[in-house]
Each structure stands twice: as C-alpha cells, then as structure tokens.
C-alpha cells in the first residue's frame, strides 16, 4: 500500500525533473523508522538535491511534517 508520504515525495520529485516517468519511491523498514528511497534518472539527481542540498532538505522537512500526524519517522534517500 502506498502511503501519503510516498505519494507526496513522488509528486514533488516528478515536478522537478526532466524525466518524470523514471521517478520511483520505495519504502523499506529501518531501525525505528521507515526509509523512503527516491530514485530518479542520473541526470536529474542534481535537480532533486538542489544547490547546497536545499531541495533535498526541503523534501525532508515536508516529509517530517507530513509524517508527524501518523507518528512515524521517515528518512529520505536519493538514489540515481
């Protein structure tokens, strides 16, 4: 089942990249938290990370705020 947090990250990432069809978000369990793995095309990684990591930080902040209601901790990994 796809969570709201997965949909949120995928939606935003698709808006940022040149190849939205290659954006996937998978969830895997970690120690005390859920890990969301965001996969994008290798040429789009810079767009998802942003200058000095600002976009990645903003994505993680949105993920944290969204997950607060469900009381689940998430970590976001960006993979090319």
From Swiss-Prot:
InterPro entries associated with the record: KH_dom-like_a/b, KH_sf_prok-type, KhpA
UniProt keywords, alphabetically: Cell shape, Cell wall biogenesis/degradation, Chaperone, Cytoplasm, RNA-binding
Gene Ontology terms: biological process: cell wall organization; peptidoglycan biosynthetic process; regulation of cell shape
Protein name per UniProt: RNA-binding protein KhpA
Source species of the chain: Treponema pallidum (strain Nichols)
Domain KH: residue ranges: 33-80
Superkingdom of this protein's organism: Bacteria
Single GO cellular component term: cytoplasm
Record's keyword annotation contains Zinc: no
GO terms for MF: RNA binding
Subunit-level organization: Forms a complex with KhpB.
Function: A probable RNA chaperone. Forms a complex with KhpB which binds to cellular RNA and controls its expression. Plays a role in peptidoglycan (PG) homeostasis and cell length regulation.
Compartments in which it is found: Cytoplasm
Protein family membership: Belongs to the KhpA RNA-binding protein family.
Family matches, as Pfam families: KH_KhpA-B (PF13083)
């Amino acid at each position: 089942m796809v969570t709201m947090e997965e949909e949120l990250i995928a939606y935003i990432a698709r808006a940022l990249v040149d190849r939205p069809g290659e954006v996937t978000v998978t969830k895997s369990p970690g120690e005390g938290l859920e890990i969301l793995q965001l996969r994008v095309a290798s040429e789009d990684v810079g767009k998802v990370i942003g200058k000095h990591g600002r976009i990645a930080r903003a994505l993680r902040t949105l993920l944290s705020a969204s997950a607060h209601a469900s009381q689940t901790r998430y970590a976001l990994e960006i993979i090319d």
